[in-house]
Structures are given as C-alpha cells and as structure tokens.
C-alpha cells in the first residue's frame, strides 16, 4: 500500500495589497494588429480615461472590459491606479489587446515582483498575429478562384 501524505494548500490573502508609491506617472506602449496604445499609469482610484471617455463608454462589450482589467485583477491592484490611454488604429479587439499589454507592462515597472504572475497569465506576450496580405492571382489572401478542369 502507498502512504498518502496531506499537504496544505497555501492561498493568497483576499485583502487588497498595500498601495505602491510612485513619484511620477508610468508610461508604456502596447500594440496588437494595427492598434497602438500609449498608457499613463498614475496612483488613483481605478478610473479609466481612454481618449477622454470612460472604459464602459469606449468599450461597451463586456468581454473587452474584462480583457482590459485582467492584468490589474491578477495582481490585485484594480482600485489603486488611474489609467489614461491614447488609442490609435485598429478595431475594438485590437485596441483592447494593445491596452491590456500596455497596462501589464506598466504594472511591471511599478512592481517588478508581479512579473512572474503576469508572465504566467500570458499578459506580457505581444500577439504577433496580423492580417495576411492578399496575393495576386487569388481572390483573398488564400482563397483561389474556382478551378475548372475542362
């Protein structure tokens, strides 16, 4: 027979983490597809200012809102920073992905100990996928015209 030993599972505390003091705004850039986002992270109460609009106003889709807040939730700092962002190019999904990357990069500059958690969650990886170009002789990037044998 095999002996099974019990191990304690260590869980992190549910209370919010202690606030981090930063002396100047943290500025980072995130990119995805054609979108480029420049972010300024300042100590605050969790407000988002995206080109002068709120998060809910700029991204009405709840999936995009969750995607953007994910790095802050991962490191328990949802209500500790105000985020000012300038978004350029692309569509809603590309901009949301670029904003998530920029926020994750800013959080690392604030607290380098958060890097492993953000890296494990995949928030620091720049998504390299982009639209494949259309080729001549084809209708789209890969779609060929109908083939006729005779």
Curated annotation (Swiss-Prot):
PROSITE patterns in alphabetical order: RIBOSOMAL_S9 (PS00360)
Gene3D superfamilies, sorted: 3.30.230.10
Keywords on record: Ribonucleoprotein, Ribosomal protein
GO molecular function, a single term: structural constituent of ribosome
Record GO cellular component, one term: cytoplasm
Transmembrane segments: none
Cystine bridges: none
GO BP annotations, alphabetical order: translation
HAMAP family: Ribosomal_uS9_B
Family assignment from sequence similarity: Belongs to the universal ribosomal protein uS9 family.
Name of the protein this chain belongs to: Small ribosomal subunit protein uS9
